[in-house]
Amino acid sequence: DISQIVEGVMPSVVSITSKMQTTGFYGFGVQESEGAGSGFILAKTDDNLMIATNNHVISEANSLTVGFSDGSTAEATIVGADADADLAVISVKIKDISDETLGKIKIAVLGDSDDLQVGESVIAIGNALGYGQSVTTGVISAKNREVSFTDGTMTLLQTDAAINPGNSGGVLVDVEGHVIGINNAKLEDTSVEGMGYAIPIATAQTVLTDIMNAKTIPAGENAYLGIIGKTMDAQYSSALGIPSGIYVTQVVKDSPAEKAGIAAGDVITGFDGNSVSTMEGLKSKISVKEAGTKVKITLKRANQNG
């Protein structure tokens, strides 16, 4: 019974309201806007509740509010994010949550997306269009689907369960109520009507764990690479005949990048054993490294394969 599955999962799903401030026209005044997304409870420590979501849900937020299944809300802060994986972890202080709410919420049970079969039934739960938690059903239409966005490519699960704006960061669960994907509504295009996408939990779990375990680097002790670069997305890559990744436009003199032999015109595709496709993603990966840390950088050079 779908209603019983949803009843068991809903206490682990949250809504996320982000408030953003932008400068008004001609630089006058400040305009405030709101965004809606979803997340799910990943872990609980003595002091904090850890919540997983998509990076694009929280990346431009000045403040975040989490709504729990019982209707209560609490302020949240960003723990960390991986822009390339479009994943983030935010936290809510336990002291800001009532005992009544703490007694109702649950930590999500993670499944195994690698074991999924095409045609298997799934349920998507999230804060669709910002109107509150909603439920849609469908099947796994495809696995390992390469999907191109304006800022890179991701390998996703495809489903015919409706995943609308606001659903991003919510859960895609199997008939056991186990999370097998993280809904992603970045792709909004009339040509893909009837297709929803989710980040496989097998992919996401490693990234989310790394984010939670990342050591805070004191100001001034962060690593520094020394390049100026531009994200080379699939559209630019195809038009210019340049590989997708970070196109290096300039290398700072005497920087670690110059000493390592990185040159203008190179395209960076990997950092420390992980693929990287955007400048934002590269910056987020560098930011959790201490100065002096040695890392492997994968790149492609004209007339070479990298």
Regions found by a protein language model. Name each.
Residues 1-237, 243-244, 253, 283, ...:
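Serine-dependent protease modules
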Residues 51, 257-281:
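Conserved PDZ fold ligand-binding element
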Residues 238-239, 258-261, 306:
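Extended hydrophobic-aromatic, low-complexity segments
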